[in-house]
């Protein structure tokens, strides 16, 4: 009958949606775990392979998930998170640039300044001057 056919079609559609929703859920879980790990370790580790290893996935798969759900590469997410930490340090503390650089995992103040300027278009000292209250 038509009703039976509609019922079967509805069950089939529901099964298909459940099947496709599952990977999305796992991807979202991985993405959230990645973002959480980055927030915890951004100052000490900026290597995508480190996070992929912690999450038991390949860097390539992590990259696919991040691009799909966050519309950024893992490296962009790491750098953005690190930059937010640096912004806080520059605005809320009187630490020297060298102290902030080493505290955020940079090997030198020059590398820190270059990273900051590349992402913001200004030097750490210009940023601090403009944002100090």
Please tell me what each predicted stretch does.
Residues 55, 104-105, 116:
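Core residues of bacterial helix-turn-helix
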Residues 49, 60, 96-99, 109-110, ...:
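Residues within helix-turn-helix
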């Amino acid at each position: 009958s038509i009703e039976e056919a509609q019922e079967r079609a509805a069950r089939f559609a529901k099964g298909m949606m459940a099947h496709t929703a599952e990977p999305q859920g796992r991807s979202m879980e991985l993405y959230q775990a990645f973002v959480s790990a980055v927030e915890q370790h951004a100052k000490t580790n900026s290597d995508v392979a480190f996070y992929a290893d912690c999450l038991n996935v390949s860097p390539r798969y992590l990259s696919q998930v991040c691009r799909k759900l966050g519309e950024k590469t893992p490296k962009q997410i790491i750098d953005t998170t690190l930059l937010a930490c640096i912004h806080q340090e520059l605005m809320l503390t009187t630490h020297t640039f060298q102290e902030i650089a080493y505290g955020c995992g940079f090997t030198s103040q020059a590398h820190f300044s270059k990273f900051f300027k590349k992402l913001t278009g200004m030097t750490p000292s210009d940023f601090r001057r403009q944002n100090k209250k």
